[in-house]
């Protein structure tokens, strides 16, 4: 009788309570398109590996504090993986602490596989003092999101308005290019 009661009580537990999920960000490609007014559109392409599931969404911390999410955010499975998910909308919710909640707009969430998350947001780099004139040079800064579990591959592409000289990276000993604690916290 005890075994029967235990089996009956297990049957009453919702199936989702049995689920487990692991996820890891495998790569990030961020493209920062800056206009002459100092406004930028940041395009994020995150490759995320998922085991188990379902994964209904996740939080990304360290996004620009003034970020304004743009429409048409999507997720799709990466070709050649176990998952076969068509292009699916994402719901983005920017929080005041610089966290971006990314929800998959799909009842079943995401199960084991590798997925590409594509989303964009606007930010004002000039207003946040992340574009600075230093003599005849102009310095552009951008701090990307933080990945608490680490990341295998990260790349940032800056697209800047044309100028008289091509962009360069600052010398390692120069005062230009130094990052202070405010920048490390998202601005």
Each language-model region and where it sits:
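Bacterial N-terminal signal peptides
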Residues: 2-11
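Lumenal/extracellular ectodomains and adaptor appendage modules
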Residues: 14-187
């Amino acid at each position: 009788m005890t075994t029967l009661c235990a089996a009956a009580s297990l049957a009453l537990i919702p199936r989702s309570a049995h689920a487990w999920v692991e996820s890891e960000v495998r790569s990030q490609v961020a493209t920062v398109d800056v206009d002459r007014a100092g406004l930028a559109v940041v395009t994020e392409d995150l490759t995320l590996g998922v085991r188990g599931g379902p994964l209904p969404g996740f939080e990304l911390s360290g996004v620009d504090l003034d970020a304004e999410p743009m429409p048409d955010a999507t997720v799709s499975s990466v070709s050649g993986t176990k998952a076969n998910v068509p292009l699916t909308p994402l719901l983005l919710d920017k929080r005041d602490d610089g966290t971006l909640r990314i929800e998959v707009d799909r009842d079943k969430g995401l199960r084991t596989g590798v997925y590409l998350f594509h989303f964009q947001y606007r930010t004002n780099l000039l207003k946040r003092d992340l574009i600075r004139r230093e003599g005849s040079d102009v310095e552009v800064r951008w701090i990307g999101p933080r990945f608490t579990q680490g990341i295998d591959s990260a790349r940032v592409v800056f697209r800047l308005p044309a100028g008289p000289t091509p962009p360069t990276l600052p010398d390692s000993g120069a005062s230009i290019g130094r990052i202070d604690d405010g920048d490390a916290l998202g601005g």
